[in-house]
UniProtKB/Swiss-Prot annotation:
Active-site residues, as the UniProt record annotates them: 127 (proton donor/acceptor)
UniProt-listed Enzyme Commission number(s): 4.2.2.-
Function in brief: Ulvan lyase involved in ulvan degradation. Ulvan is the main polysaccharide component of the Ulvales (green seaweed) cell wall. It is composed of disaccharide building blocks comprising 3-sulfated rhamnose (Rha3S) linked to D-glucuronic acid (GlcA), L-iduronic acid (IduA), or D-xylose (Xyl). Ulvan lyase catalyzes preferentially the endolytic cleavage of the glycosidic bond between Rha3S and the uronic acid GlcA, but not IduA, producing oligosaccharides that have unsaturated 4-deoxy-L-threo-hex-4-enopyranosiduronic acid (deltaUA) at the non-reducing end.
Name this protein carries in UniProt: Ulvan lyase, long isoform
Residues where substrate binds: 126-127, 280, 297, 361
Species annotation: Alteromonas sp. (strain LOR)
Catalytic EC class: lyase
Lineage top rank: taxon: Bacteria
Family under the similarity heading: Belongs to the polysaccharide lyase 24 family.
Any Pfam family: BNR_4
GO biological process assignments: polysaccharide catabolic process
Leader peptide range in chain numbering: 1-21
Key words of the record: Calcium, Lyase, Metal-binding, Signal
Length: 999
């Protein structure tokens, strides 16, 4: 056992702040000699097709796969660890259990072997980690492993029905005796997609194959345990610049998992956002809540960020994260999130000066945590993309928000780290230095890290991953040796949280205070007491921005009182107070109180003082502006006003890259107006303007406005002007900007045209995206997609005998395909094609007759129709005749005739009035179409259309006869073959009322 007891002095606090800590290495145990490690070349897309076939194990992304990811967890007195077995030809998934009480080690070997990068076992992939958890409620073991955004179709279909890998044990397996801790305690897959009798991998976590779409395209499994023992799993859905975090929940009572729920939407552009984006960070369950912290990678390749930008943070007040999501200020956010700006904390890219496209590199050294009392800590790093540039910059950032504070404190006084952890109210940096573990500690809500543990002997480690539980670090490490099989160790390090419980309790009256510049008084009564009976507070020291103000050794611990008015930065408020010669300037200041008790234990509290400026308020119309080289006009109306009543603005001066342009002493403060068109670098735009002899050339320029008020106070504002020269990116085009197909289409192959207009350059790649999701990167011409070896790329079903039907064809709607061409200079162009998938049309059907008019007592009526299917592969099932929504008869083969032959009377019962006739055709796809006509049945004898036959009709009948109008032969009531006056008696007999002749 190794113990290092230290008393260290923080460089930021000089000699005033010390921290006692006794951190001990409790146990170290070797888990195996055979942890899989990739010892070969780091491949890329140019050589991944030719990996080493010998002993060396080439890899993609990184060399680590064992002791990597979510690979170590605890359950009661056991520590569980996952790993892959080395060497190169083994690769089995392994699970080890260490009994911390008796030192017993149990290991299970699973049949599954690491499948390698995109299914090539000769190329290792570091992203295919094994996530691990044990339910504290029922003792089931859960593992999700060996996947990187796979689905049924990508990578040539290599992962069909095997794109998600989940293994789980029976209840109670976690604490079985050593002899019973065996593979048979895990549940086999007996579903229809099982790969055999030794298949312990399940395609879904719900047990329902109908849910398999919910488990596709996932990466980076990580489990959490909530305060009530519920297991949660989170993973990343999708790709690097178009992704989402998803999570699900385990119900220990029913031993079942839910489907995945999204924290944020992917394909954000389709949902109204300006661009698609992915997440680089973590979802964590800390301090009793599910939380998310990440950096964003957008698909904008023309901004100053090479990959990621920003720091984003959110948390959920729902016990399991299913709703009630908020930003760090407690404001509700859209859930699932679409616009990441709703939860943005700050921009690390603002901490270096580069502005050119792809010049800022924010990758790695990002992590975050939250202490038990609610202090939020986020670490990040920003540097120049080009390490060789003369003005190379690199900044490590620690942003933290003490519990109760309203805003983050952003500190660049931070040496940097890759991960940050928490236990109790402290934050920790745990890592390797010279291959040996060390621990640094800071009180939550502070930036005061000191080293409390470091190993000076023992094995030299290559890397590791860790889990902290109940004040102990379970550090799972791989020893640095050689080959494709290297030893794995577990170290258990006690963080000595018990001593922290004895530390003093210290606090400011408020976590944050806002005052105006020139404030006269700020008195702070700092509360400090010991939680341990018999101890007393020896002193309280106040620091402002890490500078010691004073140490007070007696109650009350009051700073800024009448005898010391200046120590809190105030001017003074009594007549006897001389004005403070060094008052606090406008801006944010960190006040820190350090309490030390009679045993030498100490604690720290912080307060943020925001000092509002009295200086003028000045601003450009916008912070940055892009124009094309040779721009004709740039007029800038600079806003300037005093923040103090009674003061006025004396002048506003404009500078370009430090050179004075002009000082304006009267409103409006307008530069680049018609009388001075050249002063902002423009060419001029009026006929009276001669061309600018010295226009601003392509490049970036800093415009600075300096506003001065009548008291001589100044304020500066800046604007970045980017003058864009003519870029010459590749030219990429589709054969057609819009393609229309019918659902179920078998084939769609398209060759994309890509070329560079610049001599000496060539096209390096053409990348195809479907609705924002990566389809494939093609690195050699011709740029053909959807060909016979990749028939599904445009969503087609497949057309050759060897093509299995596409299980995920594109549905009805409009789909956007984006082609991105990249040339040898790194310039990119993109163009979109709209693929419109139409619903298969129903059959065509037509009633041959037009609208029909009949009289009651009609004797004959037949209706005929013709129909055909929309496609040769579709058959016609039936035609059905409806009259007034009443089915008359359905006919299953032509001829389609109603009212003839054996059915001659089926249409003879229509009553007086108008009837809707519909013929509905149905095809073998259950698609339907219809044709319709109207049949109008008039009352026989009702010549004036008043719905009765009466004397008026007989008179009209006689009148029509006299006028020689042709009458319907059905009015030949006496059957002599003509309609004449002798038929009047027959009409009278049809009168609606009796005694028609007397009406």
């Amino acid at each position: 056992m190794k113990c290092l007891k230290t008393l260290l002095v923080s460089t930021t606090l000089l000699t005033a702040f010390s921290l006692n800590a006794e951190v001990t290495l409790e146990q170290q145990v070797k888990i195996t000699e055979e942890g899989l490690h990739f010892d070969g070349r780091n491949l890329d897309f140019s050589n991944v097709g030719t990996p080493d076939t010998g002993e060396k194990y080439d890899y993609f992304f990184g060399p680590n796969i064992s002791a990597h990811g979510d690979a170590v967890k605890t359950y009661r007195h056991y520590v569980f660890m996952t790993w892959y077995k080395g060497g190169k030809n083994e690769r089995n998934v392994m699970l080890s259990r260490y009994n911390t009480l008796n030192g017993e080690l149990s290991t299970i070997e699973f049949p599954h072997k690491h499948t390698g990068f995109r299914g090539d076992p000769l190329v290792g992939e570091s992203h295919n980690t094994i996530g691990l958890s044990v339910s504290p409620i029922n003792g089931t073991i859960h593992m999700v492993f060996d996947m990187h955004a796979y689905d049924n179709n990508n990578h040539g279909g290599k992962f069909k029905d095997d794109f998600f890998r989940y293994s789980f044990s029976v209840a109670g397996a976690a604490e079985l005796p050593h002899s019973e801790f065996t593979l048979d305690k895990f549940v086999k897959d007996t579903s229809e997609v099982s790969q055999g009798d030794d298949d312990y991998k399940h395609l879904t976590m719900t047990g329902d194959l109908d849910d398999k779409g919910n488990f596709a395209r996932l990466t980076y499994p990580k489990f959490f345990t909530t305060v009530d023992g519920t297991l949660l799993l989170y993973m990343r859905l999708g790709g690097n610049n178009n992704g989402a975090y998803v999570f699900n929940r385990y119900d220990a009572e029913t031993e079942s998992w839910s489907t995945f729920t999204k924290f944020n939407e992917n394909n954000q552009k389709l949902k109204g956002n300006q661009y698609n984006w992915g997440l680089y960070g973590n979802m964590k369950y800390v301090n009793g809540k599910l939380r998310v912290g990440f950096q964003q990678r957008s698909n904008d390749n023309s901004d100053k960020y090479k990959y990621q930008n920003g720091v984003y943070y959110a948390y959920s007040d729902h016990p399991d994260g299913f709703g009630d999501w908020k930003n760090h200020k407690g404001e509700p956010m859209t859930w699932p999130l679409i616009n990441s700006d709703e939860i943005k904390v700050f921009e690390p890219g603002d901490y270096i000066s580069h502005t050119e496209a792809n010049s800022v590199y924010i990758v790695g050294s990002f992590d975050w945590t939250v202490t038990e009392k609610g202090d939020i800590h986020i670490i990040s790093k920003v540097r120049s993309t080009d390490r060789g540039r003369a003005d190379y910059e690199e900044v490590y950032i620690h942003s933290y928000k003490p519990a109760g504070a309203e805003e983050f404190i952003i500190s660049t006084d931070f040496p940097g780290a890759s991960e940050i952890y928490t236990s109790g109210d402290n934050v920790y940096i745990v890592g390797l230095e010279g291959g040996r573990p060390y621990v640094e500690k800071a009180q939550g809500g502070t930036n005061n890290f000191i080293r409390v543990y470091e190993a000076s002997d023992g094995p030299v480690f290559d890397h590791g991953t860790l889990y902290i539980k109940d004040g102990k670090v379970y550090y799972y490490l791989m020893e640095r040796t050689s080959g494709t099989a290297m030893p794995l160790y577990l170290q258990i390090i006690d963080l000595d949280l018990e001593s922290d419980a004895n530390a003093p309790i210290v606090s400011f009256p408020s976590p944050s205070v806002t005052v105006n510049q020139g404030y006269e008084k700020l008195s702070l009564n700092i509360s400090a007491e010991s939680p341990v009976e018999g101890r007393s507070i020896q002193s309280v020291s106040l620091y402002i921005d890490d500078e010691l103000v004073r140490t007070d050794d007696s109650l009350p611990f009051l700073f800024g009182h009448g005898s010391k008015p200046h120590e809190t930065g105030a001017l003074g408020w009594l007549d006897r107070h001389e004005p403070n010669p060094s008052p606090l300037s406008a801006g944010r200041h960190v006040f820190k109180a350090v309490a030390v008790d009679s045993e030498g234990d100490s604690s720290t509290a912080t307060m943020i003082l925001n000092v509002n400026s009295n200086a003028p308020i000045v601003s450009f119309p916008q912070e940055s502006l892009e124009v094309d080289e040779g721009f004709e006009r740039l007029s800038l109306n600079i806003s300037a006003e005093s923040a103090v009543e009674g003061r006025t603005i004396e002048s506003v001066s404009l500078y370009i890259d430090g050179g004075l342009v002009r000082t304006d002493t009267s409103l409006p403060y307008l530069f680049g107006h018609a009388s001075k068109p050249h002063e902002t670098g423009a060419m001029g735009w009026l006929d009276t303007h001669s061309p600018n002899p010295s226009p601003l050339a392509a490049g970036s320029y800093e415009f600075t406005a300096v506003a001065t008020d009548n008291e001589g106070e100044e304020t500066t504002a800046s604007m970045l002007l980017v003058v864009k020269g003519e870029p010459e990116p590749p030219i990429v085009t589709w054969p057609n900007s819009t393609v229309t197909v019918y659902e179920g289409y078998e084939k769609l192959a398209i060759t994309i045209d890509a070329e560079t207009p610049v001599e000496g350059r060539d096209i390096q790649s053409v990348t195809l995206f479907r609705n924002g999701e990566l389809v494939r990167v093609d690195t050699r011409p011709v740029w053909n997609f959807g060909h016979s070896f990749a028939p599904y790329e445009f969503g087609a079903m497949g057309w050759l005998d060897r093509h299995e039907p596409n299980p995920s064809p594109l549905g009805v709607g409009t789909h956007t395909f984006t082609a991105v061409a990249r040339d040898s200079a790194g310039l990119e162009s993109e163009t979109d094609m709209a693929l419109i998938v139409l619903s298969l049309p129903g059959p065509s059907v037509m009633i041959n007759e037009g609208d029909i008019s009949l009289l009651t007592e009609y004797q004959n009526l037949a209706i005929t129709a013709e129909a055909s299917a929309a496609d040769d592969d579709i058959s016609l099932v039936s035609l059905a005749l409806y009259i007034d929504e009443q089915l008359i008869r359905e006919i299953y083969e032509p001829p389609f005739i109603w009212g003839s032959d054996a059915y001659s009377t089926e249409l003879l019962s229509l009553t007086e009035g108008t009837h809707l006739v519909r013929v509905v055709a149905t095809d073998s796809n259950n698609k339907q179409s219809e044709s319709s006509i109207f049949i109008n049945i008039d009352l026989l004898g009702d010549l004036n259309k008043d719905s009765i036959v009466d004397k008026a009709d007989t008179r009209l009948f006689t009148s029509k006869l006299r006028a020689g109008e042709i009458m319907d032969i059905r009015y030949d009531f006496n059957g002599d073959g003509v309609v004449n006056n002798r038929d009047t008696r027959g009409l009278v007999r049809r009168c609606t009322y009796s005694r028609c002749s007397s009406n």
